[in-house]
Amino acid sequence: MNTVGTPLLWGGFAVVVAIMLAIDLLLQGRRGAHAMTMKQAAAWSLVWVTLSLLFNAAFWWYLVQTEGRAVADPQALAFLTGYLIEKSLAVDNVFVWLMLFSYFSVPAALQRRVLVYGVLGAIVLRTIMIFTGSWLISQFDWILYIFGAFLLFTGVKMALAHEDESGIGDKPLVRWLRGHLRMTDTIDNEHFFVRKNGLLYATPLMLVLILVELSDVIFAVDSIPAIFAVTTDPFIVLTSNLFAILGLRAMYFLLAGVAERFSMLKYGLAVILVFIGIKMLIVDFYHIPIAVSLGVVFGILVMTFIINAWVNYRHDKQRVG
C-alpha cells in the first residue's frame, strides 16, 4: 500500500486523537450524565473542525518540507475533499441516531454517554475497514469498479427511500438481539448492564449502543468507498475519516433539535454519492481532478442548503398564512 504517511505523521495523528479523546472522556466523567446544550455543541463542533483544518495545514507544511509542493498540494486537497465528503454523509447517520433515541425513549442526558462509546467503537471499526479496503485495492484494482457501482446504486436508493422510525422495533436484527440478550424492560439510569438475582442483564441502553455501532458500520460502507474515489492512500483516507467522525457527537446535539428542517439534505447527499460513483466507474477513461471533485461536492452541498432554506421559507409562509 503506497502512502505518504511516515512514522512521524502516524505518530502525530495518534497523539492528537488520543489527547482529544482523553479530554472528551475526562469531561464526560466529571460532568456525569447530562445533555449537551446547543451552545456547547456549536463550540465543540467548531473545535473539531478547526482542529481538522489545523492538522491538514500541518500535514501540508510537512509534505512541502519533505516532498515539495508538487506532492503537498494534491495530498492536502485530497484530505480536505475526503473530510468534506465524510462530514456531509455523516449527517444522515446523525438522523438515524435521532430516530433510534426517539424510538427507544432514551433521555437526552443519556444520549451523550451512548455516543461517547459509539464514537470510540466507530474509530476501531472504521480503522479496520479502511486498512482492509486499502489492502484489497492494492491487490485487486478492479474492486474500485464494484465500489463505484455500489455508490451509484446507494445514491439512487437514498433519493427514493423513506425512513420511518415506527418500524424499528420490527426489524429482524432488533428482534434477534432482544431474543438472544438477557435484557431488562426499562433503562436503568446510565447503566448498560445491571445485576438481578445474581444474573447479568443488558439494559435497553446497551441495545441502543449496539444499534448505533451497527448503523455507523452501515454508513461507513458508503462513505469509505466514497473517499477511496478521491485517494487510495490509507493515511489520508483514515485521517480525514476519523477527524470527521470525531465531531459527530457534537454535530448530533447541534442538529437534533432542527432535524425536520433538513428535509432536502438526503437528496443532496444522494447526488454526491452518484457523482462519486460515476467518477470511480469512468476513472480509466477520464480522470476528474481532486480540485474539481472538491468543488463539485462543495457546490452540491451549497445548492442543497439553498434549496432547503427556500423550502422551509415556503412551508413557514404557508403555515402562517
UniProtKB/Swiss-Prot annotation:
Membrane topology: Multi-pass membrane protein
UniProt superkingdom: Bacteria
GO cellular component, one term: plasma membrane
Annotated keywords: Cell inner membrane, Cell membrane, Membrane, Transmembrane, Transmembrane helix
Compartments in which it is found: Cell inner membrane
Pfam families to which the protein is assigned, alphabetical: TerC
Main location: membrane
InterPro entries, A to Z: Integral_membrane_TerC, Integral_membrane_TerC_rswitch
Residues on Cytoplasmic side: 28-43, 111-113, 157-198, 247-261, 308-321
Family: Belongs to the TerC family.
NCBIfam families membership: R_switched_Alx
Function: Has been proposed to be a redox modulator.
Name assigned to this protein: Putative membrane-bound redox modulator Alx
Species of provenance: Escherichia coli O157:H7
UniProt lineage: Bacteria, Pseudomonadati, Pseudomonadota, Gammaproteobacteria, Enterobacterales
